[in-house]
């Protein structure tokens, strides 16, 4: 997968470019949000689905990205 495929997700850009988009180093860090954490919602089948702030490792994101482009995985997920 070349550069064209790397732009599918915001975390795939090069580090230097990601830093300039956010204006890294120009403003002080924002304080963390004091609101309490939201409990994960229950998805179909009783498995809790991660909330909007869920953290996925680089390995998990890479694996999921490859599954999106794999035709066999797309067919298996509809069974």
Swiss-Prot record:
Region (Disordered): 20-52
Full protein name: Uncharacterized protein C17orf114
Organism: Homo sapiens (Human)
């Amino acid at each position: 997968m070349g550069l064209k495929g790397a732009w599918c997700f915001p975390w795939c850009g090069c580090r230097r470019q990601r830093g300039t988009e956010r204006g890294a180093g120009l403003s002080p860090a924002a304080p963390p949000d004091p609101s309490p954490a939201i409990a994960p919602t229950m998805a179909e089948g009783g498995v809790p689905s991660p909330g909007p702030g869920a953290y996925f490792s680089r390995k998990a994101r890479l694996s999921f990205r490859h599954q999106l482009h794999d035709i066999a995985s797309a067919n298996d997920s509809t069974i």
